[in-house]
A protein has these predicted regions:
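ABC ATPase NBD coupling module
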Residues: 72-89
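Helix-to-loop junction immediately C-terminal to a conserved catalytic motif
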Residues: 55
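Short coil-to-helix segment of the ABC ATPase nucleotide-binding domain corresponding to the Q-loop/switch region
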Residues: 101-110
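The feature captures the beta-strand-to-loop junction immediately N-terminal to the Walker
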Residues: 40-42
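Conserved ABC ATPase "signature" region
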Residues: 71, 108, 119-137
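A short, flexible loop at the N-terminus of ABC-type nucleotide-binding domains that lies
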Residues: 2-4, 13-26
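Conserved ABC ATPase signature
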Residues: 82, 141-149
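Conserved ABC transporter NBD signature motif
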Residues: 63-71
Length: 150
């Protein structure tokens, strides 16, 4: 059985006026469906670069990256867009919330922008809010939430 995401000796480099700098080198990583992963490290250690490569927002220079056993080296923009929409979710250090919207409205906005019909959203939004333990904050504006709740 193949992993949801698998990196084999993946590297990312940046070329600049002062030469080549390394984003990260020879990373081996396997992620399975439903697995929760936290990438940690010092500032400048390549965490964001790695996540951008995994999500297809940036390319890699060496190695192999597989999505459910499929080699991504031939992926086109449309393939990465489909992959991100279906399988990838990032949580950013700086919150990307509309402060004047409620918890419910923020989730609804993301779902509508990703192409879902409003009629499909209500039940799923309620499930997601329950899943993360924010049921009592459903109608609370994002600006009133603590950092942890955001």
């Amino acid at each position: 059985m193949s992993h949801a995401i698998e990196l084999k000796k993946v590297s990312k480099y940046y070329a600049g006026e002062s030469g080549v700098s390394m984003g990260f080198a020879r990373v081996d990583l396997s992620l399975d469906m439903g697995e929760f992963v936290a990438i940690t490290g010092e500032s400048g250690s390549g965490k964001s670069t790695l996540l951008n490569v995994i999500s297809g927002l940036d390319n890699y220079d060496e190695g192999e990256l597989f999505v459910f056993g499929e080699d991504t080296s031939g992926f086109q923009t449309e393939d990465y867009e489909r992959y991100r929409k279906t399988y990838i979710g990032n949580i950013f250090q700086d919150f990307n919330l509309v402060n004047s919207y409620t918890v419910y409205q923020n989730i609804e906005l993301v779902m509508l922008l990703s192409g879902r019909k409003a009629s499909e959203c209500k039940e799923r939004i309620t499930e997601l809010i329950e899943l993360v333990g924010l049921t009592e904050y459903t109608k609370t504006k994002a600006s009133k939430l603590s950092g942890g709740k955001k």
